Amino acid sequence: MQGRIVKSLAGFYYVESDGVVYQTRARGNFRKKGQIPYVGDWVEFSSQDQSEGYILSIEERKNSLVRPPIVNIDQAVVIMSAKEPDFNANLLDRFLVLLEYKMIQPIIYISKLDLLDDLVVIDDIREHYQNIGYVFCYSQEELLPLLANKVTVFMGQTGVGKSTLLNKIAPELKLETGEISGSLGRGRHTTRAVSFYNVHKGKIADTPGFSSLDYEVDNAEDLNESFPELRRLSHFCKFRSCTHTHEPKCAVKEALTQGQLWQVRYDNYLQFLSEIESRRETYKKVIKRK
């Protein structure tokens, strides 16, 4: 039998096949091979009934996320709050870099707009991201049609309202929500397991919140490719390996000078590039000591 893992909990993998969910375990040979089944995996399995079955093999994955452990994702809704916590373009760009690198379509959703006195600043931010090519949503009405026939992950900084949004989209889920800690400005983690839910003709996953995000991009070329506007401009740079920092005849820097590139995004790119270089130097020092 073939199906997709829709839930993982306490060593059991719940596999959906033809609308029926089977409780399964992974064969011991998976551990020997260092393979771990994840939510989203397409698998071959055997089962005598719905409560006892075994996963026999895992199909090749098209993409994966480490945090949360989920695979074969079509798109990700990155939820950023307008306030409490304040909107953070740097954190948003970290999510976007990860998703671009993983070839997962991002959707930006802004929550808590009612806490703003006006939308002027957020509207300006929205225009910048839309000009890059990102889908940017303010409401459930804008978001819901995008969920059909897709596997969608919901992600974002803790306290931005992921579970609250999902409860509005699908009240039957009754997901626990948490308030912001006044002293830290951080939300409490309220999601304990990764599961798929059938919502609006698609599958969605609510995932553990993040207070920070580590992305897997570890070189300048991949970082450049993960910024769509830089990726497009880099074809016109004089040097193929241009890092858009000091090189002459750099199309990115020229676009920045002409006001055709958003300074905020470029500054975040430079920060991420600096972090990559710092990690590389640290790694070299560790290797040298060995």
UniProtKB/Swiss-Prot annotation:
Q: Subcellular location, in the record's words?
A: Cytoplasm
Extract the InterPro entries matched here. Answer: G_CP_dom (IPR030378), NA-bd_OB-fold (IPR012340), P-loop_NTPase (IPR027417), Ribosome_biogen_GTPase_RsgA (IPR004881), RsgA_GTPase_dom (IPR010914), RsgA_N (IPR031944)
Q: How is the cofactor bound?
A: Binds 1 zinc ion per subunit.
Q: Which UniProt keywords apply?
A: Cytoplasm, GTP-binding, Hydrolase, Metal-binding, Nucleotide-binding, Ribosome biogenesis, RNA-binding, rRNA-binding, Zinc
The protein, known as: Small ribosomal subunit biogenesis GTPase RsgA
Q: Where is the major localization of this protein?
A: cytoplasm
Biological process GO terms, please?
ribosomal small subunit biogenesis
Pfam families on file: RsgA_GTPase (PF03193), RsgA_N (PF16745)
